[in-house]
Amino acid sequence: MSSDLKRRSRTITDGRTRAGARAMLKAIGFTDEDLAKPIIGIANTWIETMPCNINLRALAARVKEGVRAAGGTPMEFNTVAIADGVTMGTEGMKASLISRDLIADSIELMGRGYMFDAIIALVACDKTIPGAAMGLTRLNIPGFLLYGGSIAPGHWRGKEITIQHVYEAIGAVAAGKMTDEELKEIEDAACPGPGACGGQYTANTMATVMEIIGLSPMGTAAVPAADPRKDSVGYRAGQLIMDVLRRDLKPRDILTRAAFENAIASVALTGGSTNAVLHLLALAREAGVPLTLDDFDAISRRTPLCCDLMPSGKYSAIHVDQAGGIQVIARRLVDGGFAHGDAITVTGRTLAEEAADAVETPGQDVIRPLDNPIKPTGGLLVLRGNLAPEGSVVKLFGYERTYHRGPARVFDGEEAAMAAIVGGEIRPDDIVIIRYEGPRGGPGMREMLGVTSAIVGAGLGQSVSLITDGRFSGATRGVMIGHVAPEAARGGPLAIVQEGDEIEINLDERRVDLLLSEEEIADRLLAWQPPAPRYEWGVMARYGALVSSASEGAVLVTP
């Protein structure tokens, strides 16, 4: 039976001509018996530069035990991983989105090179999740993702805190609303151990997405990183991959149009990160499934926001587990008719079957009932208008104002904007414009958590809006409009906004407009000259030259 499952790896291990390969593998401890079994790749994103993925080495060991117990031979390899929380607000942040595609490339190359029969990808920090999903989808061999889990919240003066509160405290100190000593206390308390950032930020949004879309086993992601149950989650995942291999269930069997619609609905219902828009567009492209920004807006309009989660809500991510897990979210989606219950998942069961097993904690108010949502429509809005002809994205929780008209405060890059905010130069009703931070212009489309948190920390979260061709962290809150397309570096209208121009944001009408005549806009665009690329060689230059628009997922395209 094992031989029948070695559909790919026999090319590496079987026959007289493969004696050299077997000799090399025996040098690191594999036996003839090991090499006669299906070879399972363990794609690990463990790295010692962040808490998000630090537990994945131990988790991988348990996964490998499960693989061996189920009749397979595991072989572990690593990819790169960039921590958004560590690099935020620096030049290093440009590497974050770029790493998504490099992770996809790494897994694809390892799968092609070593001819693994199946792959489990261990993921945690933001870009490792979509990157691994993209790589597995390209290979289209049996495989799935296993999420490392959320960090526990910290505690400060009787309050639960996360990394979000550290960044907001920086702005509060700059505004004179908090002392440096208090900031240090928050810094020391916010991240008490391993795991991904602890709200419905990008990592937990994408972990939720992967269970709902069917590419992660239901019931695994919500278990926190430091929870003792994670060991058994890893072991069972190792056993499951052998079953997935026997059934020859592949990513593209799972990633249907219906599955993507389910995923978008989960982002809307949970108030998830706007980064999910980029990543789902990119993953859909790998799966060959048509998907556009309009799909996100349409699904969000009909899906209620039911999860009271940070950054704008009350609860941290571990409370999802305490409420009953992502199965409860799945049940809300299925019961409300917001998801296709017949969509298949990696366990071989449908989403409806998985949702039916949900055990909801009595009295929990983390995941609200459908008849008492936080608001009747989802948190994602897609805006267009003469400032964003190809679209832009904003995430709302329900308390934000829906109309804002004000003067543009224009900054060519994140650092200049941050200096102005910290320096007290931004006033109520200003609309901050940060441009040349898009996929090409950055390059790398940096997240603006430092800037948005400084705005909130300074007490301007309800009176100042921000518009950028860059991205936002999942920890961002307020009227922060990102992913503006076309970006400034491609000659989008954002490039010709001048200091003091009137901008109008109308969320009810899904519009963001520069209040100038068509003739004035045309004249400015005609006079605009593209800036020189910021990098002339290396990965940054290559990415800037090949990356597509944010409205297409910011994916690399073949010239």
UniProtKB/Swiss-Prot annotation:
Top-level division of the source organism's lineage: Bacteria
A Pfam family of this chain: ILV_EDD_C
Q: Does the keyword Metal-binding apply?
A: yes
Q: Which residues bind [2Fe-2S] cluster?
A: 52, 125, 197
EC number, UniProt record: 4.2.1.9
- Which residues are recorded as binding Mg(2+)? 84, 126-127, 447
- Molecular function terms, GO-annotated: 2 iron, 2 sulfur cluster binding; dihydroxy-acid dehydratase activity; magnesium ion binding
Task: Tell whether Iron is among the UniProt keywords.
Answer: yes
Q: Which Gene3D superfamilies match?
A: IlvD/EDD C-terminal domain-like (3.50.30.80)
Q: According to its UniProt record, in which pathway does this protein act? A: Amino-acid biosynthesis; L-isoleucine biosynthesis; L-isoleucine from 2-oxobutanoate: step 3/4; Amino-acid biosynthesis; L-valine biosynthesis; L-valine from pyruvate: step 3/4
Which residues get modified to N6-carboxylysine? Answer: 127
**Active-site feature positions:** 473
Catalytic activity line of the entry: (2R)-2,3-dihydroxy-3-methylbutanoate = 3-methyl-2-oxobutanoate + H2O; (2R,3R)-2,3-dihydroxy-3-methylpentanoate = (S)-3-methyl-2-oxopentanoate + H2O
The note on the cofactor says: Binds 1 [2Fe-2S] cluster per subunit. This cluster acts as a Lewis acid cofactor.
Family statement: Belongs to the IlvD/Edd family.
Q: Which NCBIfam families match?
A: ilvD (TIGR00110), PRK00911.1 (NF002068)
State how it assembles: Homodimer.
Query: Can you name this protein?
Result: Dihydroxy-acid dehydratase
Q: Which organism is it from?
A: Roseiflexus sp. (strain RS-1)
The organism's lineage?
Answer: Bacteria, Bacillati, Chloroflexota, Chloroflexia, Chloroflexales
